Amino acid sequence: MVSSVKMILALTVLATVACTGYAIKCYQCDSLTNSECGKDIKSDSSLVLDCTKMAPPRFLQNFFPVRNATGCMKQTIDIPGNPQIVRSCYFGNIADTKVGCQTDPSLTINKLLSCEVCTEDECNGTSSLAPIAGVILLFFGLARLLA
């Protein structure tokens, strides 16, 4: 009986962790309107957005049948003589960023200088080991419970 309860608990925890893995959270800001979004962003939860609440930009919607974000991105865009950093959710194929990284074609004066794409929560900002440490602790706690 106790073994069955432990197994159900373990499966519930694993299912919860797996489900939250699909909802990626990314920094959403630009350095033009928010100086905190510059080259070295400080950890600020007010700039973090749950990407499930965001649709792809209108100019990309014809390219992607799936409307879920697949990662986070950090773009450096040159607005004639003034490089700006834009952080947002990424929609598209992580392995082929040509389409997903493009800028709005109606803004013809903007030039994309770089685009970095990643697939972990808040990875388009300052890196943090806190999420990794939490998963490791959860794993060892679950292993101890099942032992």
Curated annotation (Swiss-Prot):
PROSITE patterns under this entry? Answer: PROKAR_LIPOPROTEIN
User: What cellular component GO annotations does this protein have?
Assistant: plasma membrane; side of membrane
Which range is the signal sequence, renumbered to this chain?
A: 1-23
Q: Name one GO biological process term.
A: sleep
- Alphabetical keyword list: Cell membrane, Disulfide bond, Glycoprotein, GPI-anchor, Lipoprotein, Membrane, Signal, Transmembrane, Transmembrane helix
Topological domain, Extracellular: which ranges? 24-126
The record ties this protein, via Pfam families, to: QVR (PF17064)
Tell me where in or outside the cell this protein is found.
Answer: Cell membrane
Q: Identify the domain of life.
A: Eukaryota
| Residue positions the entry lists as glycosylated | N68
Indicate the residues removed as propeptide on maturation. Answer: 125-147
Q: Which InterPro entries match?
A: QVR-like (IPR031424), Sleep_regulator (IPR050975)
GPI-anchor amidated asparagine-type lipidated residues: N124
What membrane topology does the annotation report for this chain?
Lipid-anchor; GPI-anchor
> Any transmembrane segments, and where?
127-147
For this chain, the family text in UniProt reads: Belongs to the quiver family.
Tell me what this protein is called. UPAR/Ly6 domain-containing protein CG9338
Annotated organism of origin: Drosophila melanogaster
